[in-house]
UniProtKB/Swiss-Prot annotation:
Protein name: Ribonuclease 3
Boundaries of every DRBM domain copy: 160-230
PANTHER family per record: RIBONUCLEASE 3, RIBONUCLEASE III
Record: residues binding Mg(2+): E46, D119, E122
EC class: hydrolase
Family classification: Belongs to the ribonuclease III family.
Subcellular location: Cytoplasm
Organism field: Neisseria gonorrhoeae (strain NCCP11945)
Length: 239
């Protein structure tokens, strides 16, 4: 009973942060339900929410940076639409307080896990579109990302590890790296991935861990890039 009251309070606070009040609260509850808690979880909602998020931020950047190329816009969007940013946003909104998690996930601190928080954010964008329409969901995303887009600075924006490594290899005329899952530790809801990054003819292979495959690949790419730049630095062009 007490838990129900606390959940309702959390959901009220989350709606205020979203800037949207649900007519059908079951949609919000579904968006906040992890697969460890119930068969009717939020993963299908994530699929829709991810598309809404990517389109909206892409359009915001398109309008805000008219001189950037397609590749530059893509990299800037990747710096804004990722697990880290979404998890940070969810933490600011105290989304973890409103999550429905299975006993094991709850015990292991799932309400703080970045991947779970990020997924819940995407699922909520979908829930808004189902409760209202696409335009309303777009307004919610714009409301949440307005300040981040305003502060976005392409010139000082670090590229993600995989993109930076790819461009560094291409600049040196080497083949693209190959990533492979070497190990998956833990259960489905609490996995740790070990990924290898193989630079092929350069004879360098490194490994990195992450709570998701994407995160581990990024870490492995950063390690490989560090090695590449130390071993084969590019000569600076004379002015």
């Amino acid at each position: 009973m007490k838990d129900d009251v606390l959940k309702r309070q959390a959901h009220t606070a989350i709606q205020k942060k979203l800037g949207y009040a649900f007519r059908d609260m079951s949609l919000l509850r579904r968006a906040l339900t992890h697969r460890s808690h119930h068969a009717k979880h939020n993963e299908r909602f994530e699929f829709v929410g991810d598309s809404i998020l990517n389109y909206t931020v892409a359009r915001m950047l398109f309008d805000a940076f008219p001189k950037l190329t397609e590749g530059e816009l893509s990299r800037l969007r990747a710096s804004l639409v990722n697990e880290g940013v979404l998890a940070e946003m969810a933490a600011e909104m105290n989304v973890g307080d409103g999550l429905y998690l299975g006993a094991g996930e709850l015990k292991s601190g799932g309400f703080r896990r970045p991947s779970i928080l990020a997924d819940a954010m995407e699922a909520m964008f979908a829930a808004v579109s189902f409760d209202a329409d696409f335009n309303t969901a777009e307004k919610v995303v714009r409301h949440l990302f307005a300040e981040r887009v305003r502060r976005a600075d392409f010139q000082n924006q670090a590229k993600d590890g995989k993109t930076a490594l790819q461009e560094a290899l291409q600049a040196r005329r080497f083949a693209l790296p190959k990533y492979r899952i070497e190990e998956q530790i833990g259960h489905a809801n609490d996995s740790m991935f070990v990924i290898s990054c193989d630079l092929g003819e350069l004879g360098f292979v490194c490994r990195a861990k992450g709570t998701s495959r994407k995160a581990a690949e990024q870490e492995a790419a950063k390690e490989a890039l560090k090695w590449l730049e130390e071993k084969l630095p590019l000569k600076k062009k004379k002015k």
